[in-house]
Amino acid sequence: MITLIGTGHVFDLSAALLNIFEEKEPEIIGVELDPQRYQAIMLRNTDPTTYHAAKKNLPIIYKMLAQFQENMAEQYGVNAGDEMLTAINYAQSHQLPVAFIDTNAQQLFVHMWKIMPFSEKFKLLFSGVAGFFVSKKRVEQELKHYQENFDSYIQEIGKKFPTIKRTLIDERNEYMVLKLVSLHEKHQKIVACVGDGHVPGISALLQEKQIPFETIRLQELQKPHIQEMNGSSAHFSINYKPF
């Protein structure tokens, strides 16, 4: 069984995630990171000066996205990617293996930028600059729109930024599913933490491959009663696909 958890990289989800891990008792925990991004997050927390110096060599759009996430996470009192560190730290403290299930982010962004039409690059850069001035309230409004109208939201992204949708969403979904299928062949109980926007696509691909899974979405993680549970009696609204 794969438990697929939809997270948000700028929200404080630690308490909810720990409750789920205690409830599910996984044999292995997968995270939407590649080893290089994990090392970068650790460097950010242990040596900020070196981390910021290293960021100068990253692709420009990668840097813009990372900075936007860091700015928004700061408004929520966390660091971007803290939910992935929560998962990794839990695994390490319980002597569980960790699986990095995402593709190499830097290579992905270089490839995406190379194949992206100029018009899409221009729109993306403009949106990226505008993103630095987005308020917490606006992010929450967008999140509500996304949660209530996921299909139309993804369609909008596909129309405005087709290369981004194909590269950052669709192709990564396929890559992560291959990783999850490989884990499923070796482990009975798997918990995987991925960005919530990947959950529908990954779910559809797992269903095609007849892999049993359940999902816990970001909206559920953010409910106060989930955050406040002590882990002994956690219950979630779960979409279960038995085969």
Regions found by a protein language model. Name each.
Residues M1-F243:
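Compositional signal for N-terminal targeting/processing segments
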